[in-house]
């Protein structure tokens, strides 16, 4: 299909709008990682106790992704996105007003509900809205929104929290979401539900061993990453003995490296997703094993964070491409399952980091995370050799 320059420009503008929405959603998902110490101090709790909020959020997303996707499968996507943002904004206002930790957790559950639906439909929408032959690049742009949430949203949210209080951070995210909602209303066309699948799709997907193997890989590698990443801010301050300001800089470096990873994947991901993901998991293993040794200096931690950020971004993108390639006939169901399983990994990793920090030593979170990372590497090599497939091999 030939797309004239104007149509191509409009198509990219719509994908950019989704990328902005991804930035907003990922900023609020990631920002508690940089605010754990401040929230703990506010409620007179231990940092590890507050960290359970990360697990609750992730597991709510995991449990609700598929049910919510099925309940909304026939709703026009533009209208659905608008409704999601209304709940998203209201939940952030409640976060701002939270008078105790329980209320804060309730507000985060509301945000998690919107998250569960948003990430089950966004990748497939980006592919629908992208110019012909640019599906991997469209996914890369969405991932850039994710990376910018890490490189800008998370550090800025942390700085705002340091100087104006963590409540202000959540309020600012809510106001940013309001502006984004206005942009969505003005720019997005009507998007009827397509290839969303139904409960009938589940047995079909479950009979695809390549897809099931990929879901298992996702859960294991994400668990590995979040075991250490969830507690990187207190690790930098309490284990490495470095300043709170350097913790902010480190998060900035890690997120910036994620942008590099998304650019690399956008260039090579169409045909080499399997190789890129395998290399990235290898990098993740090395980074986790070297986390404690690197804590002896700011320079070593900064260098490690560059490779870590590149690795996790390539892993996330590669997994999405593989899922979409293996389930082109039920993309929303497949992505809902992917989002749920991804968040099982986040919750499991955050819980592992929580338990290690409470009952053992926070200094070992890298070593603990490296165990599932090594298992993920072996599994990745096995399944990618057995089931090689690329996104562009599938019919549009």
UniProtKB/Swiss-Prot annotation:
It comes from the Bacteria. Gene3D superfamilies: MFS general substrate transporter like domains (1.20.1250.20). The chain crosses the membrane at residues 15-35, 50-70, 81-101, 103-123, 136-156, 169-189, 209-229, 246-266, 275-295, 301-321, 333-353, 364-384. GO terms for cellular component: plasma membrane. One of its GO terms (molecular function) is carbohydrate transmembrane transporter activity. It is found in: Cell inner membrane. It is a multi-pass membrane protein. Belongs to the major facilitator superfamily. SotB (TC 2.A.1.2) family. Involved in the efflux of sugars. The physiological role may be the reduction of the intracellular concentration of toxic sugars or sugar metabolites. NCBIfam families: PRK03545.1. This is Probable sugar efflux transporter. It comes from Salmonella arizonae (strain ATCC BAA-731 / CDC346-86 / RSK2980).
